[in-house]
Design a protein with these regions (language model features):
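PLP-dependent class I/II
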Residues: 1, 5-331
Length: 331
């Protein structure tokens, strides 16, 4: 029931190059279990997975906590020189931190590279239906969302390409615990996961509720459109706040509910002191918490520069404004 509902729903929304069927799915209790299961199936202890920075920080325990894999190498060549096998790459598309989508060309290039080198490409598309129109950052043309399921090329090895999706973000349903591993050309993967997926199966109640939601096309379409509209509105609110306060942020977001902002530089511009760069994130994090506002530090996500923080803007407008005001007071 749940596999059929998810397949039918995603066929409508992700435009796969070939129709999704129930046999193409392994259902899990969320994307974390899905990531861990795929890693277990395609890699061996000591193997490495590549992650782009900044990355979704929970990928790290998902990949390594129980498997013994290495989660990050700065470059493929570095791993190769160390005689270490790279099992594959995992990407968040849309990106979980920057709120941007990979372009069609970028996805094809990545998928082709990993196919040619006998490695796996894993696309986490948990924000697939949370793309919206950016009407604030003028002059930029963000790439629209493209699912890797919609791409095809003679250069690709389909059995090495896996997709992950969940209702947790697009439907604001973290507690429902419904996730999916999608692999159209690798039945051996699904067969291998039968035993381990036994420990991460959603409840019958979750399956029933999720199927009812996904099968109600009129309601689900309305919900998705309303969500997109509200996310676009909230992004505009936060982006204008950042511009008003001279806070640099990564412009061009058009998906999910994040604004990647350089709060560190803004703080240093208005505060003289002796805070070392390596201590800046922890210092600001402590300061924010003292003023009862939580903003995730880029340090947690492998940020390549200090002082960057992730602002989540999917709250009620009054709560969001209160949080932004508290951040503003610290600058």
């Amino acid at each position: 029931m749940i596999k059929t509902a998810v397949a039918t729903f995603l066929n409508r929304h992700l435009q796969p190059s070939s129709p999704l069927e129930p046999a193409h799915f392994t259902i899990t209790n969320g994307c974390s279990s899905a990531v861990e299961h795929i890693a277990w199936a395609i890699a061996n202890p000591g193997d490495a997975f590549l992650l782009g920075r900044p990355y979704y920080n929970t990928f790290v325990p998902d990949l390594v906590l129980r498997t013994g894999f290495n989660y990050y190498k700065r470059a493929f060549e570095k791993a190769a020189m160390g005689c270490q096998r790279v099992a594959g790459l995992i990407v968040s598309n849309p990106n979980n931190r920057l709120g941007r989508c990979y372009s069609r060309a970028s996805l094809l290039n990545l998928m082709t590279f990993f196919s040619e080198n006998d490695m796996y490409f894993i696309s986490d598309e948990i924000y697939a239906l949370s793309a919206w129109e950016n009407e604030v950052d003028r002059g930029l043309e963000p790439a629209p969302f493209t699912s890797c399921l919609s791409l095809t090329s003679t250069d690709l090895t389909p059995d090495r390409i896996h997709t992950i999706w969940s209702m947790s973000k697009d439907f604001g349903a973290n507690g429902l615990r419904i996730g999916a591993i999608i692999s159209q050309s690798n039945p051996s993967l699904h067969k291998a996961l039968v035993a381990v997926a036994l420990y991460s199966s959603p409840s019958s109640a979750s399956n029933h509720i999720a199927a009812n939601i996904l099968e109600d096309e009129k309601w689900s379409d309305m919900f998705i459109q309303t969500n997109r509209s509200r996310l676009a509105d909230r992004y505009g609110l936060v982006a204008r706040w950042a511009n008003t306060h001279g806070i640099t942020y990564t412009a061009g977001a058009n998906a999910a509910f994040f604004l990647w902002a350089d709060l560190g530089s803004a703080w240093k511009r208005h505060n003289s002191g002796t805070i070392k760069d390596e201590d800046l994130d922890d210092f600001l994090m402590k300061l924010f918490l003292e003023h009862k506002v939580y903003v995730s530090s880029g340090k947690e996500f492998g940020s390549e520069s200090v002082g960057w923080f992730r602002i989540v803007f999917s709250q009620d407008e009054s709560q969001l404004l209160t949080g932004l005001e508290r951040v503003s007071l610290l600058h």
